[in-house]
């Protein structure tokens, strides 16, 4: 065998004396050590081919090219006569990747990071990349305050040049902040400044935001908060000179020192606007008006810039540039703002597209749009479309993206990206409710029927005191102008005595239809007609019931429990809704007002009217809308007409999971007062002329309920389910009263409360959990009443299935 000559042994060294400057002609190329990589693939990566004349530079380039493929750990090129012999050692193939000891970082996140670095099962292993990954992960742990953390990549060889890769984590504990010092502050105390930070050296029990665990990212945010605090108060020359973070020897404690220069306070002297204002100079200048002498404020400058961009966006200028340059006059301590505006090009909308609506038809989404194709782009119109899609309640999330059309200087496409949620359910089963006992339920409810936007429901309930069935359907776009049409038919067999109400049974059925007329983006008026037949029996007349029967000319016996009558009523139904909530379910911002009313029309056996008003307002207290304050009210009032009273079975009730939690359902308010009484009533005798109090709730013709809730992130729930679960702490208050109640001497002598007094307010406080389950919204609450009256029944734990209010 001819002696083999070593040409080059590494990337960084080549021998220029082996072949001389002229080199030699390659007749053939042979490989040694190839296993997974095909010969053809290796040859294609080389710059040398048989027949080429090669020299030292060509050999160096060949080695570099083979290394660049990422398939080889070692490459050597030798000459055997006129043949190039390429000896390679392939990198091992990754057979599996596992993790151990990682608690702060999830496996999925680690896999994504590894894949982004080219480390995945089936690929070759680059040990250099592993070292970078180890260091990068350790740097991550250091950034969140875990300075004792270590990450080690363990490679286990397997047959056929394969390896198992295991990343072993030792996370350690988070270093806690021992002290935060601010040096150079004179205008504000250190405690006052630190109170605006997320990082704290002391965290009171009530502070749910502060944290003693050091994180580099949070420190950067706190430094920006500190800068904004000063800039918003006129300190235009404020500067953070340096920041020192010191670690204790045991790596468990952190000391932070922030050195600052406050400077003096500066006032605004004026604003000068220049640039391409696109013909909207008057509107832009109105946004930049200031009161001379006002303190300089960085946040006001940012707000002004955002206002200008938003204004131009409404006129089709999708990408305006607004830059503010402060001119600081140190002599008189003033700042003049120079605002330069470049409106840029004006854009048309070529197309509006929807992504993610696998169930909902495009037409259902498109009819909610206020931005039109072929028209100037209006950022406010695009945002209105997003708001309207959110309020439908069909989607978990709605995002918008304005994309420039390639090759066009003045066209964009608007893309709405939605994530659909389950808007329907089918259920059949047996359950137990704290307010209804054993319950049998069957139903189909679909708020977006076959993706058409129709709401269709077939529901039935059977429990201890009620048998109910209903079919309903609503077309939200009965006309192209957005007039809605809805209707329902129902049957209800209700035994009030079994529901802890006064004694009567009501079998009713009816039908109604309603048209909804949109007034503008946020207001809708409703009008409709209804018919209901009520067949009452097993009535044991109590005072309020007796009063009603007398007003309609019906007679009843105090000695009989089998009084009864039937009534047919036709009603004109009306309503108004104002809705500016940010989404249809689990809102976090905005308000909703809902007014409903009905009044009987000629041909009815009864003559009365009834009104209810519901309000809800959400106030987010953080930018992510995870912490929200919710205020709710419910008001109700009804009365008779033409000398008649409103039917007792139309009364308002309070208590239970939808009104005042912690009290038994419908238990708040007036109680039945019977003539003569029965064995369960508080009577000294069975004298028919005597009135006897009881614990049977009868409701009233007036109601007021209020609630204040603090919505918080739900512990132990991942971000994936954050939009499906809601936790809140609440305070509820409410009362029901009877404006027609006569507080006579006989009633007072019998110890009966004055049920016409609206001041008998009940209160409770507790915690609630809501879950958007496949069966519908499930609401669990635990409440403790802290203001109640004789006869009230408590029920601390409650749950129900139904719509959130």
Curated annotation (Swiss-Prot):
Membrane-side (Periplasmic) residue stretches: 21-424, 447-454, 476-483, 507-522, 578-590, 620-628, 711-724, 773
GO term, biological process aspect, one: Gram-negative-bacterium-type cell outer membrane assembly
Record carries keyword DNA damage: no
Keyword Membrane appears in the UniProt entry: yes
GO cellular component: Bam protein complex
Ranges facing Extracellular side: 434-435, 463-465, 496-504, 536-563, 601-608, 640-700, 738-762, 785-798
PROSITE patterns listed in its UniProt record: POTRA (PS51779)
Residue spans crossing the bilayer: 425-433, 436-446, 455-462, 466-475, 484-495, 505-506, 523-535, 564-577, 591-600, 609-619, 629-639, 701-710, 725-737, 763-772, 774-784, 799-803
Subcellular location: Cell outer membrane
Record domain POTRA: where: 24-91, 92-172, 175-263, 266-344, 347-421
UniProt superkingdom: Bacteria
Signal sequence, start to end: 1-20
Keyword terms: Cell outer membrane, Membrane, Repeat, Signal, Transmembrane, Transmembrane beta strand
Similarity comment text for this entry: Belongs to the BamA family.
Function: Part of the outer membrane protein assembly complex, which is involved in assembly and insertion of beta-barrel proteins into the outer membrane. Constitutes, with BamD, the core component of the assembly machinery. Does not normally serve as a receptor for CdiA-EC93, the contact-dependent growth inhibition (CDI) effector of E.coli strain EC93. However if extracellular loops 6 and 7 are mutated to match the sequence of E.coli then the protein is able to act as a CdiA-EC93 receptor, conferring CDI on E.coli strains expressing the mutated BamA. The same mutations also support the delivery of CdiA-CT from strain 536 / UPEC.
Subunit structure: Part of the Bam complex, which is composed of the outer membrane protein BamA, and four lipoproteins BamB, BamC, BamD and BamE.
Name of protein: Outer membrane protein assembly factor BamA
Species: Enterobacter cloacae subsp. cloacae (strain ATCC 13047 / DSM 30054 / NBRC 13535 / NCTC 10005 / WDCM 00083 / NCDC 279-56)
């Amino acid at each position: 065998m001819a002696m083999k000559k070593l040409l080059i042994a590494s990337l960084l060294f080549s021998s220029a004396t082996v072949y001389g400057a002229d080199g030699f002609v390659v007749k053939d190329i042979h490989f040694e050590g190839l296993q997974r990589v095909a010969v053809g693939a290796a040859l294609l990566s080389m710059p040398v081919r048989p027949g080429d004349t090669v020299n030292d530079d060509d050999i160096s380039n060949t080695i570099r090219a083979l290394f660049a493929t990422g398939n080889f750990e070692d490459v050597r090129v030798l000459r055997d006569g006129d043949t190039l012999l390429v000896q390679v050692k392939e990198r091992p193939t990754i057979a599996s990747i596992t993790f151990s000891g990682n608690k702060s970082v999830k496996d999925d996140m680690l896999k994504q990071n590894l894949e982004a670095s080219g480390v995945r099962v089936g690929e070759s292993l680059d040990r250099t990349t592993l070292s970078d990954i180890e260091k990068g992960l350790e740097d991550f742990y250091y950034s969140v305050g875990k300075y004792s953390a270590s990450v080690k990549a363990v490679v286990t060889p397997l047959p056929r040049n394969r390896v198992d890769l295991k990343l072993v984590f030792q996370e350690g504990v988070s270093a806690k902040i021992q002290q935060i010092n601010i040096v150079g502050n004179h205008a504000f105390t250190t405690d006052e400044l630190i109170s605006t930070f997320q990082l704290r050296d002391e965290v009171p029990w009530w502070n749910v935001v502060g944290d003693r665990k050091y994180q580099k990212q949070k420190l950067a945010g706190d430094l920006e908060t500190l800068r904004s605090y000063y800039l918003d108060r006129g300190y235009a020359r404020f500067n953070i000179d340096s920041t020192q973070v010191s670690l204790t020897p045991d790596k468990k404690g952190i000391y932070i020192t922030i050195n600052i220069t406050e400077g003096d306070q500066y006032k605004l002297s004026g604003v000068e606007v220049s640039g391409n204002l696109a013909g909207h100079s008057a509107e832009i200048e109105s946004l930049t008006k200031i009161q001379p002498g006002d303190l300089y404020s960085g946040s006001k400058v940012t707000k002004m810039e955002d206002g200008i961009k938003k204004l131009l966006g409404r006129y089709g200028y999708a990408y305006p540039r607004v830059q503010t340059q402060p001119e600081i006059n140190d002599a008189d301590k003033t700042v003049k703002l120079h605002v330069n505006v470049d409106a840029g090009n004006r854009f048309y909308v070529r197309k509006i597209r929807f992504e993610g609506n696998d169930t909902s038809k495009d037409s259902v989404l498109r009819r909610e749009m206020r931005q039109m194709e072929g028209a100037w782009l209006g950022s406010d119109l695009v945002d209105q479309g997003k708001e309207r899609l959110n309020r439908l309640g069909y989607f978990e999330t709605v995002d918008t993206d304005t994309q420039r059309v390639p090759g066009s200087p003045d066209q964009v496409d608007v893309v709405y990206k939605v994530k659909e949620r389950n808007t329907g359910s089918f259920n059949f089963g047996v359950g137990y409710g704290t307010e209804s006992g054993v319950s049998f339920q069957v139903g189909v409810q679909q708020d977006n029927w076959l993706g058409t936007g129709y709401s269709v429901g077939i529901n039935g309930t059977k429990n201890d005191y009620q048998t109910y069935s209903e079919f309903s359907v609503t077309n939200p776009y009965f006309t192209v102008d957005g007039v809605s049409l809805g209707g329902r038919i129902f049957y209800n067999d209700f035994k009030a005595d079994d529901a802890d109400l006064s004694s009567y049974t009501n079998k009713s059925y009816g039908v109604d239809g309603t048209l909804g007329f949109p007034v503008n983006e946020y207001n809708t008026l409703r009008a409709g007609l209804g018919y209901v037949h009520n067949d009452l029996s097993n009535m044991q007349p109590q005072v309020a019931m007796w009063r009603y029967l007398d007003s309609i000319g019906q007679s009843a016996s105090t000695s009989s429990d089998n009084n009864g009558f039937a009534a047919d009523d036709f009603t004109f139904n009306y309503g108004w809704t104002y809705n500016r909530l940010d989404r249809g379910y689990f809102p976090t911002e905005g308000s909703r007002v809902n007014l409903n009313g009905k009044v009987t029309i000629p041909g009815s056996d009864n003559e009365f009217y009834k009104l209810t008003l519901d309000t809800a307002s959400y106030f987010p207290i953080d930018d992510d809308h995870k912490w929200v304050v919710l205020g709710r009210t419910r008001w109700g009032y009804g009365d008779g007409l033409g000398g008649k009273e409103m039917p007792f079975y139309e009364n308002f009730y309070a208590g239970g999971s939808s009104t005042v939690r912690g009290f038994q359902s419908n238990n708040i308010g007036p109680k039945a007062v019977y003539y003569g009484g029965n064995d369960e009533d508080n009577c000294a005798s069975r004298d028919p002329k005597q009135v006897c109090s009881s614990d049977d709730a009868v409701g009233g013709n007036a109601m007021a309920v209020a609630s204040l809730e603090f919505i918080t992130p739900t512990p132990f729930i991942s971000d994936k389910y954050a939009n499906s679960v809601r936790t809140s702490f609440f305070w509820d208050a409410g009362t029901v009263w009877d404006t027609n109640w006569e507080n006579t001497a006989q009633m007072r002598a019998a110890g009966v409360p004055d049920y016409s007094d609206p001041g008998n307010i009940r209160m409770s406080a507790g915690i609630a959990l809501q879950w958007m389950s496949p069966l519908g919204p499930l609401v669990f609450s635990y409440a403790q009443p802290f203001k109640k009256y004789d006869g009230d029944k408590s029920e601390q734990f409650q749950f129900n299935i139904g719509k959130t209010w």
